[in-house]
């Protein structure tokens, strides 16, 4: 469970992801948005998952956080369709999510959670104060044989 914040712009953040994470983060974003709705009394299409993960805590803390992640989720849906020529199943819950947005507490955008770490792979950028840089470094270290080079390099 994570939000790879490679840019403060939710659309660019989605565009910058490699193919593997584009697919994975679309599902995880949907799960985070659903968990926030469930925690605040709604009935989301996906069950609550990883309740106390820092990304989950961040998502449900304020409506501005939830809105940022929703825009990122929409961008991931578009990016997935552009890259693969098909619609991801998690794209189909957009209206259900949006109809329960009002349940999320009002508030400003708070600092992104920095979870840029995978100790089994020897990658840890959680000490980095600039969260977007932390995720860029994390992904650069883990970039596999994707055809595209990271756009920030």
Feature map (PLM): residue ranges:
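Aromatic-residue-lined binding/catalytic grooves and analogous aromatic/hydrophobic interfacial grooves
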Residues: 101-153
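Generic preference for hydrophobic/aromatic residues in regular secondary structure cores
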Residues: 3-4, 11-12, 94-98, 139
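Domain-level detector for trafficking modules
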Residues: 91-105
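Sequence-level detector for tyrosine residue identity
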Residues: 16, 46, 73, 80, ...
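Amphipathic alpha-helical packing elements
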Residues: 38-83, 89-93
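Intrinsic-disorder-associated interaction segments
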Residues: 19-22, 26, 62-65, 69, ...
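Phosphate/adenylate-binding glycine loop and adjacent helical scaffold
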Residues: 1-44, 54, 61, 74, ...
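Generic alpha-helical secondary structure signal
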Residues: 8, 20, 57, 77, ...
């Amino acid at each position: 469970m994570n939000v790879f914040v490679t840019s403060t712009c939710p659309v660019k953040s989605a565009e910058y992801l490699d193919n593997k994470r584009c697919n994975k983060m679309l599902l995880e974003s949907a799960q985070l948005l659903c968990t926030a709705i469930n925690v605040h009394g709604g009935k989301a299409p996906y069950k609550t998952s990883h309740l106390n993960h820092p990304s989950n805590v961040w998502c449900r803390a304020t409506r501005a956080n939830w809105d940022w992640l929703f825009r990122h989720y929409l961008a991931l849906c578009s990016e997935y369709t552009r890259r693969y020529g098909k619609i991801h199943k998690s794209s189909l819950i957009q209206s259900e999510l949006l109809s329960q947005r009002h349940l999320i507490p009002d508030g400003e955008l708070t600092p992104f959670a920095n979870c840029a770490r995978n100790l089994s792979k020897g990658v840890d950028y959680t000490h980095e104060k600039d969260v977007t840089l932390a995720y860029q470094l994390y992904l650069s270290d883990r970039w596999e044989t994707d055809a595209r080079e990271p756009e920030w390099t």
